């Protein structure tokens, strides 16, 4: 039996140890969902049980310092979500799991996915307050992204009709539950941004279970909300329901009805304010006219006390002029205020950001095209230099020399064999050929005469 064959023979204990090390190193920790059976808890406080599905099972242990953190008592037949390490019990050769944590499956698994995505997006800055857009005050047109047949749409329209009937509403119907719902919600948000006909969007649905609301915990929906140029109010479920969309949105409303309250004006309150302002204006005008009438009365009385008709006529003429000037001044002030209002409206229309956003998008696309071209040219240059270097390396490779029929022989000390003085009879040599190594033993060393080489006999 050769030396290499002897080194590959395992004992049972060595085999089990090697398999255990491979399992622990290669597999590490995993998440597993399964049904519990054969659950037991001896006096040590450790838990021993079997995890199974309809086709296979595996033994599992959960030590006391880990199971004391579990918030429920596992029962046979219960579906659980387990985080465990794979190992092998060497004395028996049984492979098993060592559980680190356990929680009920179903909502527990969804909650785990929710927390992982929440931490990821928070680390990327999608929840930062600096990215939040303010809502328009007041909104000129509202978009609603929800199911066309759901109660949420009915609630939103009912509140808007009650508070501000003149506010236009555009509905972007979409599924809010099921496998296709996240992609439909994303497309609705993108369509609303492309059409740019609304200055605020309500994205949401009515209440439901965690699975029902799961479309609003989808990463694609979260990124679509973050990338929206139109401010978005999230309105998912009830006040106690929290989704990823709530964290990314510019504003979170506890319910769809509350979202409608946030984006609309209370028209009844506005009417009351206008009526109050009108009443105060009328009172001010009455007071102003009363003061002027009193002034006219005093002047008239003074004129009557002086009696000269000519002076009275002059004073009457002056009063008429003052009255006309007063009326003209009032008309002038009204015209100036009207012109100022028109100029402010024109300035407001000129600062709409759509054109500037379009130009920025074009510049970004141009920069992206030039960057891709530059990277492609640089990569082509790298590929050419790499190919040349590989060709040069293959030309000087020792393996190429071996492929032509040559070999390399090493002494027992590992040095290259160049002369007969390096070896003696009985030494073992290692010879490298093109496709492997050959070990040989020297039986005789013959020194060549003159230019003749040593003869090595094996």
From Swiss-Prot:
InterPro entries: Exonuc_VII_L, Exonuc_VII_lsu_C, OB-fold_nuc-bd_dom. It catalyses: Exonucleolytic cleavage in either 5'- to 3'- or 3'- to 5'-direction to yield nucleoside 5'-phosphates. It is an enzyme of class 3 (hydrolase). It holds the Pfam family Exonuc_VII_L. GO terms for biological process: DNA catabolic process. CDD domains: ExoVII_LU_OBF (cd04489). It is found in: Cytoplasm. Its EC number is 3.1.11.6. GO terms for molecular function: exodeoxyribonuclease VII activity; nucleic acid binding. Keywords: Cytoplasm, Exonuclease, Hydrolase, Nuclease. Its main location: cytoplasm. One of its GO terms (cellular component) is cytoplasm. Heterooligomer composed of large and small subunits. Belongs to the XseA family. HAMAP family: Exonuc_7_L. Bidirectionally degrades single-stranded DNA into large acid-insoluble oligonucleotides, which are then degraded further into small acid-soluble oligonucleotides. This is Exodeoxyribonuclease 7 large subunit. It comes from Yersinia pseudotuberculosis serotype O:1b (strain IP 31758).
């Amino acid at each position: 039996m050769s030396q290499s064959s002897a080194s590959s023979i395992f004992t049972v204990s060595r085999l089990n140890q090697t398999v255990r090390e491979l399992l622990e190193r290669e597999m590490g920790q995993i998440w597993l969902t399964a049904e519990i059976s054969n659950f037991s808890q001896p006096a040590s406080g450790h838990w021993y049980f079997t995890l199974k599905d309809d086709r296979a099972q595996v033994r599992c242990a959960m030590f006391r310092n880990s199971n004391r953190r579990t918030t429920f008592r596992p029962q046979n037949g219960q579906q659980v979500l387990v985080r465990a390490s794979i190992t092998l019990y060497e004395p028996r050769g049984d492979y098993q799991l060592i559980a680190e944590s356990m929680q009920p499956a179903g909502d527990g698994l969804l909650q785990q996915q929710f927390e992982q995505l929440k931490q990821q997006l928070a680390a990327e800055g999608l929840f930062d307050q600096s990215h939040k857009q303010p809502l328009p005050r007041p909104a000129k047109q509202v978009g609603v992204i929800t199911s066309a047949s759901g109660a949420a749409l009915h609630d939103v329209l009912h509140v808007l009709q009650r508070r501000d009937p003149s506010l236009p509403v555009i509905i972007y119907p979409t599924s809010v539950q099921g496998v296709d719902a996240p992609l439909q919600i994303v497309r609705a948000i993108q369509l609303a941004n492309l059409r740019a006909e609304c200055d605020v969007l309500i994205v949401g649905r009515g209440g439901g279970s965690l699975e029902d609301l799961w479309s609003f915990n989808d990463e694609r929906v979260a990124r679509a909300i973050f990338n929206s140029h139109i401010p978005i109010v999230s309105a998912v479920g009830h006040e106690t329901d929290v989704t990823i969309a709530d964290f990314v949105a510019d504003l979170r409303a506890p319910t769809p009805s509350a979202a409608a309250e946030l984006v609309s004006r209370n028209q009844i309150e506005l009417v009351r304010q206008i009526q109050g302002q009108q009443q105060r204006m009328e009172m001010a005008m009455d007071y102003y006219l009363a003061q002027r009438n009193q002034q006219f009365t005093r002047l008239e009385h003074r004129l009557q006390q002086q009696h000269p008709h000519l002076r009275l006529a002059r004073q009457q003429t002056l009063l008429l002029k003052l009255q006309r000037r007063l009326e003209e001044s009032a008309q002038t002030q009204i015209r100036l205020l009207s012109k100022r209002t028109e100029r402010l409206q024109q300035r407001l229309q000129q600062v709409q950001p759509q054109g500037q956003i379009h130009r920025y998008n074009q510049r970004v696309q141009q920069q992206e095209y030039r960057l891709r071209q530059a990277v492609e040219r640089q990569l082509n240059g790298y590929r050419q230099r790499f190919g040349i270097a590989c060709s040069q390396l293959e030309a000087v490779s020792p393996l190429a020399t071996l492929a032509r029929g040559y070999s390399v022989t090493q002494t027992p000390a590992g040095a290259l064999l160049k002369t007969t003085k390096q070896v003696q009879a009985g030494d073992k040599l290692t010879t490298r050929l093109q496709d492997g190594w050959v070990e040989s033993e020297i039986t005789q060393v013959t020194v060549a005469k003159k230019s003749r080489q040593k003869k090595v006999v094996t």
